[in-house]
UniProtKB/Swiss-Prot annotation:
It comes from the Bacteria. Keywords: Glycosyltransferase, Magnesium, Pyrimidine biosynthesis, Transferase. Pathway: Pyrimidine metabolism; UMP biosynthesis via de novo pathway; UMP from orotate: step 1/2. The keyword Cell membrane does not apply. One of its GO terms (molecular function) is magnesium ion binding. It comes from Enterobacter sp. (strain 638). InterPro entries: OPRT, Or_phspho_trans_dom, PRibTrfase_dom, PRTase-like. This is Orotate phosphoribosyltransferase. It catalyses: orotidine 5'-phosphate + diphosphate = orotate + 5-phospho-alpha-D-ribose 1-diphosphate. The keyword Glycosyltransferase applies. It holds the Pfam family Pribosyltran. 5-phospho-alpha-D-ribose 1-diphosphate binds at residues 26, 72-73, 99-100, 103, 105, 124-132.
Length: 213
């Protein structure tokens, strides 16, 4: 685990974005942990979040031309990541996001920001079922652009309804890499360093045994 990944886990814990306990997911599964990126909700949170996304992006080495944030959660993420790339990595990258409803007046259309072209890095909070990615792919392809990769905050590394995860489905269907700031594996490595979190470690390991990929 890299220093920025450990720092991200601590940031998420401090903000109550990452919690341990017993949570029922939309799928009906009982999970020993829960991640709610919507709680990164202040100016300082966003500034820090962008730095972690930018770090993971640079670390991945994937070439891309533009950041795309799918509405709605992806919009602030794309914005803060673009700022962090400029301020901390000297990379001035264009960004773009979509509207859920196409505008009929003014400049019209359903895209805001830079022109959607070239190799696109899609940024979002998490991938649950991959629906937002599929909707975004329609927009990207309609504009003649290509998907360079997808960047999310957490990869839960668990099976969907079949034998592979929603993330593996996206990688298979679109031939792109999905990268994340942290994975379930990183989370377990962090818990292993914390004797006071031994109970949580046991339940997270058991969950991975049952649902992991």
């Amino acid at each position: 685990m890299k220093p920025y990944q450990r720092q991200f886990i601590e940031f998420a814990l401090n903000k109550q974005v990452l919690k341990f306990g017993e949570f029922t997911l939309k799928s009906g599964r009982k999970s020993p942990y829960f991640f709610n990126a919507g709680l990164f909700n202040t100016g300082r949170d966003l500034a820090l979040l962008g730095r972690f996304y930018a770090e993971a992006l640079v670390d991945s080495g994937i070439d891309f031309d533009l950041l795309f944030g799918p509405a709605y959660k992806g919009i602030p993420i794309a914005t803060t990541t673009a700022v962090a790339l400029a301020e901390h990595h000297d990379r001035d990258v264009p960004y773009c996001f979509n509207r859920k409803e196409a505008k009929t007046h003014g400049e019209g259309g359903n895209l805001v920001g830079s022109e959607l072209q070239g190799r696109i890095m899609l940024v979002d909070d998490v991938i649950t079922a991959g629906t937002a990615i599929r909707e975004s792919m329609e927009i990207i392809q309609a504009n003649g652009a290509s998907l360079a990769g997808v960047l999310i905050s957490l990869d839960r590394q668990e099976r969907g309804r079949g034998e592979i995860s929603a993330i593996q489905e996206v990688e298979r269907d679109y031939g792109c890499n999905v990268i994340s700031i942290i994975t379930l594996k990183d989370l377990i490595a962090y818990l292993e360093e914390k004797p006071e979190m031994a109970d949580h470690l046991a339940s997270v390991r058991a969950y991975r045994e049952e649902f992991g990929v």
